[in-house]
Amino acid sequence: MEEPSEPEGLIDWKERCVALEAQLMKFRVQASKIRELLADKMQQLERQVIDAERQAEKAFQEVQVMEEKLKAANIQTSESETRLYKKCQDLESVMQEKDDIIQNLALRLEEQKQVRIQEAKIIEEKAAKIKEWVTVKLNELEVENQNLRFINQTQTEEIRAIQSKLQELQEKKISCVSSPKTSEGQRNLTFGCFLSRAKSPPCVVRCEEVSKMASNEPEITEGRCVEEMEIAEKPADNQVQENSRSQRKLHETSCSSEQNQKTRASFAMDGGTSQNSGVPVSDWSSDEDDGSKGRSKSRCTSTLSSHTSEEGGQCGRLGSEAYLTASDDSSSIFEEETFDGNRPEQKKLCSWQQKAPWKAQGNLAKGRSQSGVKEQDSSSDELNKKFHSQRLDYTSSSSEANTPSPILTPALTPRYPNSLPGKGGAPLVPPPFQPPPKLRVPNVFSISVALTKRHLSQPQLCSDRMFGTNRNAISMIRPLRPQETDLDVVDGDGAEAVNRMDTGCDDGLFSYDSQDPPPCADDQENSEAPKKAPCNKPPTPPLHRFPSWESRIYAVAKSGIRVSEAFNMEHANKNSADILSYSAASLYTSLIYKNMTTPVYTTLKGKATQISSSPFLDDSSGSDEEDSSRSSSRLSESDARSRSGPSSPRAMKRGVSDSSAASESDYAIPPDAYPIDAECSQPEQKLLKTCLASCDNGKNEPLEKSGYLLKMSVRVKTWKRRWFVLKGGELLYYKSPSDVIRKPQGHIELSASCSILRGDNKQTVQLATEKHTYYLTADSPNILEEWIKVLQSVLRVQAANPLCLQPEGKPAVKGLLTKVKHGYSKRVWCMLVGKVLYYFRNQEDKFPLGQLKLWEAKVEEVDRSCDSDEDYETRGCYLLSTHYTIIVHPKDQGPTYLLIGSKHEKEAWLYHLTVAAGSNNINVGSEFEQLVCKLLNIEGEPSSQIWRHPMLCHSKEGILSPLTTLPSEALQTEAIKLFKTCQLFINAAVDSPAIDYHISLAQSALQVCLTHPELQNEICCQLIKQTRRRQLQNQPGPLQGWQLLALCVGLFLPHHPFLWLLQLHLQRNADSRTEFGKYAIYCQRCVERTQQNGDREARPSRMEILSTLLRNPYHHSRPFSIPVHFMNGLYQVVGFDASTTVEEFLNTLNQDTGMRKPAQSGFALFTDDPSGRDLEHCLQGNIKICDIISKWEQASKEQQPGKCEGSRTVRLTYKNRLYFSVQARGETDREKTLLLYQTNDQIINGLFPLNKDLALEMAALLAQVDIGDFERPFSTPAGPVTNQCKANQTLKQVIERFYPKRYREGCSEEQLRQLYQRLSTKWMALRGHSAADCIRIYLTVARKWPFFGAKLFFAKPIAPSSLGNNCVWLAVHENGLSILEYTSMRLVTSYMYKGLMTFGGYQEDFMVVVSTQSKDRPTEKLLFAMAKHKILEITLLIASYINSFHQQKTTFHHLSAPALLSPRTQAPQARVMGSQPPLSNSRPTKGPTLL
């Protein structure tokens, strides 16, 4: 036990004590330090307490000050709270009242809806009742018609029996028959006038019937018998005349017996006809010509036309134009029908009308000698009274229906009645025997059952002679023109004619007075006729008289619309030479019109279709056909059209459409000559397939086909109908199917280099070979699709969708790849759009060879280290041995291999194909793309750590590799440079004097992205990265990054998933309280607008960048603005954004200025030329305003490299381009004013014919509008000389602005002084007159020129030409193309638009191919030397006119069906050119549309 205790005894306690004392000292030192620190801390806290107490004291003092202020203002907290509480209660009570009002209004709205529903049901019931009543009434009339025919037949038998008895009593004729003969003869004469059923005027009597009326009774009864037998044999569709026979008698016997006696007297004296004409004056003369005579005639005649008599034959179209009809075919609305003097029917009518007076005189003289003079009998009065009462009973129930609607009354007349050809080149000159028709009241009881059962908007099937002349009534109705003065009546007979107003549209529109009844059949009235007229006729309205000053202007204008012969012709010839040699720079034109030089258009289906964007060359459509014989003569129009009817057994046998069965002559009838009505053409399922090879359920594609196509010839650009046969890899064509055993007229070799391009029209295709380009047109889109499919099969194309156009949308990636499938390889151009991979033959091809749907497909890279290169070798193509392979394996399909030549391209394709397939694979693409894919998988969770990754945040250093996958190393290098450019833009401070630095940086960066679309994703990702870190307000970097991002998204948008990332980024940063957030909101608006209107084409302009950087664009919905100039010198500032199109821009402009839409007003937006020349360019509606401004700036800098004018920008002008006379009624005051100044611009530049006197009158009118009253210089003591100088200066300005240049050039000082004096006299005569009156008179005078509103182009015909070698004006107007003399501006010839076959560029000239009426030369090609920019302008202008009328016709056609409600006879269906044939019984009909 001692051993363990020994160590305890060995402890050195002293040392341990020393150690413990040392530790104690350390503790003491530490304690002292702690005390010191604690003391310091306490002192610091004490100081803080003192400061806090001082601040609290100060705050307490401030509180006291504030309380004192509040007390001083008598504002206490309790009172303010009470007041706020009361205000809150008041607001709540008001809100409750508003809610109650809203609920009451909602209840009332529901009640109104229920009331409207009930009213609609009532109206439908009434409509059904009316429909039933009309059906019953028609049935009754039909039964009555049958009864009348039976009665007529019975009376005919009785008449024959009486005739036999009369022959037996021939010897006792004088003693037994003389007394009743007078009464019976008078009775027959009373009704005999109405037996004629000629389509000539109803008052013209057949010579045979006149002789029968004046002869004995057997002859009369025999004539009636024969006529009734002829009527009984007419088809059912013409029974309306039989039905209205008795009613016509009832209606027309309203004339008194005095008028009947007077009729006989007039027949005895004048032969029943008007002087010097076979047509009566009363029915066919205008109100102006008749004067008081036309208004004094009774209401006897209300029918519009009647059947043609046997002697008259089928007369010309002499029916009324009150209710014009239009077919549903594709003839345009502007195709006005005119007389054709070569028609035998019209010659027959003319000769018959010339012979009628002499026959009538002879027969009447003979009848008068036999029947005697005393023919007044009491039975005549009784019959007249009886039938008059019956007529009133019949017509009382349909008085409203008999009243024509003023909306339906205007007649359709050509704007240029004496100039436009009917079928091409022949002038529109009506025959001398044609009288002007008058509007007449239709007869409601003349509607036949067949006409009512048929839908009124359907076109009728026509006979061979009158094919295509049917018209739909409402679709051809034009609104009335505004009331203007007719200057043609100034020199009329009598004092009253001087001041008469013309209420029609123009000189060709027949006036109609709703108070004037149609003239009676008794057309030969003398001066005593008004005394014997019916008393119920209203008095003649008073004639309008003009003031003396207005009459003086109209008198000058009557003969003033012509060019004075005294002006300098040498100057005009010099200007013409300058115009021909004047050409604009093509840079800006190509930018505006998308590289369109001088396009070529053709007219198909009434619509102008572009078939080429470049001018035709000599070999543009060459063939061996041009050298073949042209001995085949062209069939006549009637023969050609007769084959197209459905009754043709040949057409039915072949099973082709109407147009396919048309003429097989050398020159085909244009496709717009055939109807497009669905019931006229045959159904598609009945069409006989012309393919010779069976499709075998789609497995074996056909390689042979035959059928009719239209081919454009080479020398004369017109369409020729040929029979094409595709066989053995060649396309042969013949004149007809019967010529296939002969040598073909030409052949087209189909090889691998051939390409098939579809034109703008659905029926036109362009077949381009190595040598020539062929333009082919099929009869229908379905037939064309069959041809394209077979042609592509022949070209060894495996088309998954051969007729699919190039897909819309921006491709994510595109390039030339090798596609391998099923062991076959092919070099194709691939394009990834959305989730579909399209592949084409080449980059320019518009038709994809096939497509590959990638959604849920398996996309991966293939390791081909074990494969041999021979497996992937392609025919004719050399591939590197180091190419890469991507396999695309869609669901339920075999795999497709894509061979790619470079690694960068492979990575780009692999990433985009993987994204398109919707794969969740995040191992493809760059690091940035993988992070975006991860964010997409978690739907952008805000709390995710991925957002904090450095790759997604702002960085001050540059990047070493692109953020996105790019297909080439050069693009990767460019992406790194692009990031540096963005850094320079963001980091450099914006300084207004040095703003051009930022402008150049932004334009260069965005221009690179527009040039290389692959970089668009890259720059968007870079800007998202650089704007993700929010900085303090005094650091401008990120703010300028937002500005650059705003410029970027206004131009283009990235693809998915970067677009999703951009939208999420903008959404997270949108905040209206900060400037960054405001720019984020502005970027959101830009993204929406870009998605709506598509990407831009040009980089941002200087104005756009300045507005974005300096003018806070987030404060405005339209951050940019530009002035639009008008022809009167004023301008309107219009706002727009980065994606605003011209169409949207014009809608805003029209809304601000109070003008109509461009489709109605014809106004368009023009820009000046950046070269500074006096040229203008019309802007199309789909171009963006910012692109126009940018392209204009680029062109200006390139054309004027030495000048750098930052303030010079594009000048926009808004003026009239298309003038429609039918739209003049709705012109606003602003439009009239602008038309006034635009007409003045034509006048001062010599594009409007008027002599010096009229030019001075017009200048005075315009001075009154522009300046106001002329201030006469008074001699005052202050300064008489000063006033005189001021007046002379004003007159000088007026002469320079409003007087033609050619009349004032070369004038001496004395002549100018006299001109100033004459102008001042005329100007002072207008003192006190308003601007509206002066504008009205100015436009009234200007519209008297037939080519008002037309655009004139200087041209020189190229020899050989039928127009000679002199310079001419080409006037493009609403009805066609007219050629005017250069000096006098007189009309040379005109061509309607339906006669224009082809027009556009031909080498360096302007070409027009027109159809003529010559059999030897059915078409004519006219060439004109013009400036290049003028060729483009006139081509686009003609196409715009044609397409505008086509669109109007389509609109009117759709609106026509419900509007055809007014009852009519068959007579309104007859037009001026000829009567329509009866409705075919085989035509399918619909139920009547009565309401």
From Swiss-Prot:
Residues 1120-1449 form the FERM domain. Residues 19-177 form a coiled coil. Residues 657-666 have a biased composition (Low complexity). Expressed in the kidney and testis. Expressed in the kidney exclusively by glomerular podocytes. PANTHER family: PLECKSTRIN HOMOLOGY DOMAIN-CONTAINING FAMILY H MEMBER 2, PLEKHH PROTEIN. It is found in: Cytoplasm; Cytoplasm, Cytoskeleton; Cell membrane; Cell projection, Lamellipodium. The keyword Magnesium does not apply. The gene is Plekhh2. GO terms for molecular function: actin binding. Residues 374-385 have a biased composition (Basic and acidic residues). Residues 702-796, 810-918 form the PH domain. One of its GO terms (biological process) is negative regulation of actin filament depolymerization. InterPro entries: Band_41_domain, FERM/acyl-CoA-bd_prot_sf, FERM_2, FERM_central, FERM_domain, MyTH4_dom, MyTH4_dom_sf, PH-like_dom_sf. It is a peripheral membrane protein. In the kidney glomerulus may play a role in linking podocyte foot processes to the glomerular basement membrane. May be involved in stabilization of F-actin by attenuating its depolymerization. Can recruit TGFB1I1 from focal adhesions to podocyte lamellipodia. Residues 232-435, 506-546, 612-668, 1466-1491 are annotated as: Disordered. This is Pleckstrin homology domain-containing family H member 2. Keywords: Cell membrane, Cell projection, Coiled coil, Cytoplasm, Cytoskeleton, Membrane, Repeat. Residues 253-264, 392-406 have a biased composition (Polar residues). GO terms for cellular component: cortical actin cytoskeleton; cytoplasm; cytosol; lamellipodium; nuclear body; plasma membrane. Self-associates. Interacts with TGFB1I1. It comes from Mus musculus (Mouse).
